[in-house]
Amino acid sequence: MQILADLLNTIPAIDPAAMSRAQRHIDGLLKPVGSLGKLEALAIQLAGMPGLNGIPHVGKKAILVMCADHGVWEEGVAISPKEVTAIQAENMTRGTTGVCVLAAQAGANVHVIDVGIDTAEPIPGLINMRVARGSGNIASAPAMSRRQAEKLLLDVICYTRELAKNGVTLFGVGELGMANTTPAAAIVSTITGWDPEEVVGIGANLPTDKLANKIDVVRRAITLNQPNPQDGVDVLAKVGGFDLVGIAGVMLGAASCGLPVLLDGFLSYAAALAACQMSPAIKPYLIPSHLSAEKGARIALSHLGLEPYLNMDMRLGEGSGAALAMPIIEAACAIYNNMGELAASNIVLPGNTTSDLNS
C-alpha cells in the first residue's frame, strides 16, 4: 500500500542538536552531574523528539488498547474462555479494569478499540475498527491478509495522528485478547531467531503441563506460514493478530508526529519488533515501561536494545505498565523544567564545564 509506504518514509529523525542542548542544560542544574541517572537520559531523549520542540513536556496522555480475538485459541493455548475478551472490553468502558484504574491515577485517557473481537454486533462504547471477528488460526493458516494488515495499520496511524493534533503528546499502548501471547511469541521467535522453546511463556496462567503444546503451536505456525523476518508487515499478517497490528500502528503514528510511545509488556515488545522492521526510525521514540514477567521478554527487549524502567513482576497487559510509567516521564520533564541552576546559586562543581556555569 503506497500511502503506508510514503508515511513510513516521512518519520522524522531525532534532533541531535536539541539533545546536546538538553544535556548542557541538565548538567547545569542544581545537582551533581549525572546524579539523577536515568531521569536525565530520559529527559534528553524527550528533548530530541521533534514533536516536543526541544523541550521535554507532557500535554494530554492517551493509552490505546487494541482488543481482538485469535483463531489460535482453538489450539488450547489459553485457559480463559474466548468470550472473556468481549467481557473485559465492556468492563474497560466502565473504567473498572487494571489499565483503567492505573490510567485514571496517571491522568490518562483510555481509548478502547475493537480491531477484531468475535461478537455478532459491535460493543457499545468501543471505538470500532474491527477488521474481522478474530484473526485466522496461525497454526493452520495466516492470521490475516497483507491487505488487511496494511489497512489496519493505516487506520490506526491516522487515528493516532488525529489524537496528536488534539494535544496528546504522550502515548501508551495496550491490548486485550485471549490467547494473544501465542502470536506474540511467534513474532518474537521469527524476528529474533530464537527458538520458540526459549520464547513461549505461560501467558495468563497457562498450566505448565500445557506449555509444550503452546510451544509446538508456535513452531508449527512459523513453519507453515514462513513469515519473512525482514518484513514486519508480512510477520504481522502471517503469525500476528489484529491487536498486534494495531499496537504497531500506534507506534508508527506517534513516531510520525515526533512523539513518544510508552511500551507495555510482551505483546508490545512483539509489535515493536515488527514496527521497527517497517521503519527503524521509530526506535528512538519507543520508551520501555516495565519488564514483563513473560518468558521471552528479555529476548525481545535485548533485540530492541531497550532497558525497561520498572520491574514489577507484571504480566497483565492491557497497557497497565504503560500507565504505571507515565509519572516517570512527567518526572523527567519536571526536573528539566523546574529545577534551579548551579550558576544562579554561584555553585561550581569540580569537573563541570557546562556553558550554564559560565553564563
UniProtKB/Swiss-Prot annotation:
The entry's keywords: Cobalamin biosynthesis, Glycosyltransferase, Transferase
Cystine pairs: none
Listed NCBIfam families: cobT_DBIPRT, PRK00105.1
GO MF annotation list: nicotinate-nucleotide-dimethylbenzimidazole phosphoribosyltransferase activity
The protein's annotated pathway: Nucleoside biosynthesis; alpha-ribazole biosynthesis; alpha-ribazole from 5,6-dimethylbenzimidazole: step 1/2
Highest taxon of the lineage: Bacteria
Protein name: Nicotinate-nucleotide--dimethylbenzimidazole phosphoribosyltransferase
EC number: 2.4.2.21
Signal sequence interval, chain numbering: none
Residues at the active site: 318 (proton acceptor)
Gene this protein is translated from: cobT
The keyword Transmembrane is assigned to this record: no
Organism: Escherichia coli O127:H6 (strain E2348/69 / EPEC)
A GO biological-process term: cobalamin biosynthetic process
Reported function: Catalyzes the synthesis of alpha-ribazole-5'-phosphate from nicotinate mononucleotide (NAMN) and 5,6-dimethylbenzimidazole (DMB).
InterPro entries to which the protein is assigned, alphabetical: Nict_dMeBzImd_PRibTrfase, Nict_dMeBzImd_PRibTrfase_bact, Nict_dMeBzImd_PRibTrfase_N, Nict_dMeBzImd_PRibTrfase_sf
Pfam family, one: DBI_PRT
Keyword Signal belongs to the record: no
Catalyses which reaction(s): 5,6-dimethylbenzimidazole + nicotinate beta-D-ribonucleotide = alpha-ribazole 5'-phosphate + nicotinate + H(+)
Family: Belongs to the CobT family.
Record lineage: Bacteria, Pseudomonadati, Pseudomonadota, Gammaproteobacteria, Enterobacterales
Assembly with partners or alone: Homodimer.
